[in-house]
């Protein structure tokens, strides 16, 4: 595969990436879902400006860059990166798959993503944002991945086939190379999210034989060695619904944001990482508030109103973690991400 073209000189990019993080934070979101465009703004929604054509934006931790999905020639699914301030976008990956799975390293220098053909196995790759160099970490069928707090390791879930429910387990691997370490052997573990207090939250799909349409999701915790596995949540999940997926941790690990999903349903749920107590952030309904991120201080949830249906009216908003009235940050917008 040819190396991606660099539209900005490497030295300029290096200087930009070396800038100190500003006091403010960056917000990004999508407008016009049928001809999607990506915007960047301050974290209060001010100063919004278009930065590219595409969707599913993800702001880098330092707030300087935004990665997003761009549809290229012949419907090619491209991972592009652009400076939040604006400028030409760079294509880092062609054949990007499952664009809702993307992870920035904590230092904003590396992106983890999936690539492959439209059908079949995927490759989990680490991409150097500055050079575009790629390294394959694993192959298979993946259900989520995240970096360790210091960025030295990656945790991911992988199954050997597309069979549903997936026979998936969680693995840990060094970002500098080496053999992956298998952390679970239950064949029903997926979507690991590495937290800041030496624990990983992940999904176990359980009670598949008891339920009419397949298993439900519950959240579990374990340490980075795969030990101390503990069930965190006990959730009522109707037959056509799936249950909880982890979304984001607060910086001190005291608060956890999750999403309750299922047929025509997606809404934000707060979870106590110690007790497992859970509460819908707003209303538990089909067209509820979709949560996409939690601020580092754990006080504010970012998301959008109107549910997941692209035909609905959406507004990007923030909501206090304890609940309350949403503050609209961007009207007629969805899929928000921020560095706050």
Predicted regions and their residues:
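Bacterial N-terminal signal peptides that target proteins for export
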Residues: 1-10
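Bacterial N-terminal signal peptides
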Residues: 9-18
């Amino acid at each position: 595969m040819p190396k991606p073209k660099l539209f900005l000189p490497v030295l300029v990019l290096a200087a930009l990436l070396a800038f100190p993080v500003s006091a403010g934070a960056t917000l990004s979101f999508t407008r016009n879902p049928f001809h999607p465009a990506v915007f960047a703004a301050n974290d209060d929604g001010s100063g919004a400006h278009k930065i590219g054509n595409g969707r599913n934006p993800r702001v880098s931790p330092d707030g300087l860059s935004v990665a997003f999905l761009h549809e290229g020639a012949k419907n090619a699914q491209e991972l592009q990166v652009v400076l939040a301030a604006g400028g030409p976008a760079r294509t880092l990956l062609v054949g990007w798959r499952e664009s809702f799975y993307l992870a920035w390293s904590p230092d904003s220098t590396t992106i983890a993503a999936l690539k492959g053909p439209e059908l079949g196995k995927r490759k989990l790759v680490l991409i150097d944002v500055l050079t575009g160099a790629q390294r394959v970490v694993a192959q298979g069928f993946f259900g989520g991945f995240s970096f360790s707090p210091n960025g030295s390791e990656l945790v991911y879930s992988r199954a050997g086939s597309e069979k549903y429910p997936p026979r998936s387990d969680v693995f840990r691997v060094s970002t500098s190379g080496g053999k992956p370490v298998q952390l679970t052997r239950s064949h029903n573990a997926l979507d690991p999210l590495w937290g800041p207090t030496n624990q990983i939250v992940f999904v176990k799909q359980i009670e598949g034989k008891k339920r009419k349409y397949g298993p439900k999701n519950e959240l579990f915790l374990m340490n980075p060695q795969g030990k101390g596995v503990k069930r965190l949540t006990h959730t009522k999940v109707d037959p056509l619904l799936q249950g909880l997926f982890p979304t984001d941790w607060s910086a001190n690990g005291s608060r956890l944001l999750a999403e309750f999903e299922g047929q025509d349903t997606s809404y934000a749920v707060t979870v106590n990482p110690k007790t497992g107590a859970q509460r819908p952030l707003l209303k538990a309904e089909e067209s509820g508030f979709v949560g996409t991120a939690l601020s580092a201080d754990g006080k504010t949830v970012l998301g959008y109103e109107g549910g997941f249906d692209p035909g609905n009216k959406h507004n990007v908003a923030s909501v206090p973690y304890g609940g309350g009235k949403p503050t609209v940050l961007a009207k007629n917008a969805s899929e928000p991400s921020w560095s706050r």
